[in-house]
């Protein structure tokens, strides 16, 4: 783990405690995945739409990037870091792991 990644259990604990209320949680899954279940405080931004939404994202907020298993979110995290975003954190394991810790 580094400053640009967080384990799902640690993320879930912060989420439950309200420690992420000022953060931007970006869910990069597809809409059908989102509809099957998502975090109330998350924003749906499918991976393929991220480039066109760069200008609308707030570089001053910490962003937590989630997907189904942590692969797409890792790629989006790397993309955002490469485009000048510094406060970007990939949630390892994605919703598959997060759900275990929020149940």
Role assignments for model-derived ranges:
Residues 65-66:
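Short, surface-exposed ligand- or partner-binding patches at beta-edge/loop junctions that are enriched
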